């Protein structure tokens, strides 16, 4: 096993770009100063492969000017933000688009021990021991609940039933389906749960979770944004996943058809509320102290397009997130945002004129509310989720004093506090001592 790890490490080092290794391995024992999600009202993290804008097209995006957290040289993977796709972490079993059964194809036929061994080696190569950034696992080929694998994912059900038939010729078709479901869900759970357990154990300061979880299943236009019936029950069945997660990363991407529509805010709101419910119900390590942070994945353009969101659409996505009490957002995008100098210039201008100022205003409102309402020991969240009240709408005095009575009254009337770890009380005014006790 040691020899195989060594061989893989040598191979990986030869394949990785030299600059990437320089960042990751030059100071292997150094603690990375990732985004401080535990003690900041709202964090915006950049997860877009835009390094080529500077490297190839000499277009600088100036993300730090607007307080956006990025990796060194805007790399897609780094010490502040890293995302692992299906072929970048271990031996994830899946069926390729051309029908190949990769690493066994279905979870039941995957080699979990080999997978976990490889994950451990990859973590040691790519992330410093002190990694404290956003860590996302993006596995979308199959879903851990049997009934959610429909459409193109039905192949996982078919192969699971085929496997049972080969091993149990005596079973009826109904029993085949039941056993196939049981075996699939147990194996899917093992791959996801043990992978998460391992990365949290090896890099405990990171914020680890699976992209797209929890889901709300609310794409149906007739439901006015409400989650699909049975959503809570489905997500409750994934309690094992939430118990191992140290952050949640639901998706709040916006389709073009909802541009400028209040239905967009409703759809995003219900997704966030379900994620916040899950975060407050299952807390990592069974801690009774603090809900795990929720950082929804957002796009600065409509889904499958390069059409940027305007301020109204940003309010319906990022604005909803901060006003409902999310710890932050992760901004994601594809390579095509940096495909040419023209596109990089468009992106830079959008950041400078729309996105950046919008984020600055939101973060300022979140910080003011945290200071005035929560003694800077918590983040603010709407008292009534459907009120539509925004943290950025609080009145600001001419003198810009933090003690402005107008904004304090607004915050007290429309928001409440979600305390950071170690603090308690209605306004997060009491420091906790020991486990679950507070110091009055």
What are these regions (language model features)?
Residues 237, 243, 252-301:
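Glycoside hydrolase catalytic-domain groove-lining segments
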């Amino acid at each position: 096993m040691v020899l195989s790890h060594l061989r893989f490490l040598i191979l990986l080092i030869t394949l990785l770009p030299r600059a990437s290794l320089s960042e990751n391995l030059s100071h292997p024992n150094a603690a990375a100063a990732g985004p401080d999600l535990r003690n900041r009202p709202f964090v915006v993290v950049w997860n877009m492969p835009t390094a080529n804008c500077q490297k190839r097209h000499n277009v600088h995006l100036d993300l730090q000017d607007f307080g956006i957290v990025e990796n060194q040289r805007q790399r897609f993977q780094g010490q502040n933000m890293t995302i692992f796709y299906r072929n970048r972490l271990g031996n994830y079993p899946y069926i390729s688009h051309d029908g190949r059964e990769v690493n066994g194809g279905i979870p039941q036929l995957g080699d979990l021990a080999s997978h976990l061994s490889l994950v451990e080696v990859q973590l040691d190569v790519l992330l410093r021991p002190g990694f404290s950034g956003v860590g996302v696992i993006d596995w979308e080929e199959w879903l851990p609940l049997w009934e959610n694998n429909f459409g193109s994912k039905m192949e996982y059900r078919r192969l699971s039933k085929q496997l049972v038939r080969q091993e149990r010729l005596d079973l009826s078709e109904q029993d085949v389906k039941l056993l196939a479901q049981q075996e699939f869900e147990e194996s899917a759970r093992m791959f996801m749960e043990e992978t998460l357990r391992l990365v949290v154990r090896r890099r405990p300061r990171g914020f680890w979770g699976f992209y797209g979880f929890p889901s709300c299943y609310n794409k149906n236009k007739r439901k006015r944004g409400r989650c699909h019936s049975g959503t809570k029950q489905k997500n409750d069945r994934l309690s094992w996943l939430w118990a191992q997660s140290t952050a949640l990363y639901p998706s709040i991407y916006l389709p073009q058809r909802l541009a400028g529509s209040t239905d967009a805010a409703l759809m995003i709101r219900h997704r966030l509320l379900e994620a916040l419910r899950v975060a407050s119900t299952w807390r990592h390590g069974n801690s009774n102290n603090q809900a795990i942070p929720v950082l929804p994945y957002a796009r600065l353009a409509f889904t499958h397009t390069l059409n940027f969101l305007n301020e109204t659409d940003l309010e319906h996505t990022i604005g909803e997130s901060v006003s409902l009490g999310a710890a932050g957002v992760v901004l994601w995008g594809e390579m095509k945002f940096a495909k040419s100098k023209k596109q990089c210039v468009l992106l830079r201008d959008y950041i400078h004129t729309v996105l950046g100022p919008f984020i600055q205003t939101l973060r300022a409102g979140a910080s003011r509310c945290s200071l005035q309402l929560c003694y800077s020991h918590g983040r603010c969240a709407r008292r009534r989720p459907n009120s539509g009240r925004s943290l950025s709408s609080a009145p600001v005095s001419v003198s810009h004093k933090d003690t402005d009575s107008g904004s304090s009254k607004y915050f007290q009337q429309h928001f409440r506090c979600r305390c950071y770890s170690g603090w308690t009380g209605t306004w997060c005014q009491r420091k906790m001592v020991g486990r679950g006790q507070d110091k009055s």
